[in-house]
Amino acid sequence: MVPRLKEKYQTEVVPALMQEFQYRSVMQAPRLEKIVLNIGLGEAIQNSKALDAATSDLAAIAGQKPVITRARKSIAAFKVRQGMPIGVMVTLRGPRMWSFFDRLVNLVLPRLRDFRGVSRRSFDGRGNYSLGLREQIVFPEIDYDKVDKLRGLEVVIVTTAPDDEQGYALLKRLGMPFRD
């Protein structure tokens, strides 16, 4: 079964982008490549249970098992040794990516406190978009009563767009609520 948003992308978004940017081929139109979710855990150094809680939260949000990220270098100021677990991340592609993006745009972002749209300035110059969420409880998959601590997470949306303008056009047409 094709995700709802992917169908919209193929039937509405690609033709609109082809017309706007005068692409010669359908393959030139920018598309979502992957979505990376990351929770950085500074407290994992003292509290190893924090890692398990963050892993289960991210697994519930993403629908697949996250990988534990480890410190590349030792940093004495942060009391971090090389190889210590300092976060969890998951990379979504294919149908899971489309369904997550759909949930993010239509359920999660509107549930944020004082939400007036996401900033246009969070593009990286290569058409990719990054956004941070302050708490994981805005996701409907997370049970509020089982949360031990509020953790933020980063969401990076990687597109094939060559620049920010085309990346913005793609995400805007897919329903991303930008504040203009």
Swiss-Prot record:
GO terms for cellular component: ribonucleoprotein complex; ribosome. GO terms for molecular function: rRNA binding; structural constituent of ribosome; tRNA binding. Transmembrane segments: none annotated. GO terms for biological process: translation. Keywords: Ribonucleoprotein, Ribosomal protein, RNA-binding, rRNA-binding, tRNA-binding. Belongs to the universal ribosomal protein uL5 family. NCBIfam families: PRK00010.1. This is one of the proteins that bind and probably mediate the attachment of the 5S RNA into the large ribosomal subunit, where it forms part of the central protuberance. In the 70S ribosome it contacts protein S13 of the 30S subunit (bridge B1b), connecting the 2 subunits; this bridge is implicated in subunit movement. Contacts the P site tRNA; the 5S rRNA and some of its associated proteins might help stabilize positioning of ribosome-bound tRNAs. This is Large ribosomal subunit protein uL5. Part of the 50S ribosomal subunit; part of the 5S rRNA/L5/L18/L25 subcomplex. Contacts the 5S rRNA and the P site tRNA. Forms a bridge to the 30S subunit in the 70S ribosome. HAMAP family: Ribosomal_uL5_B (MF_01333_B). It comes from Roseiflexus castenholzii (strain DSM 13941 / HLO8). Disulfide bonds: none annotated.
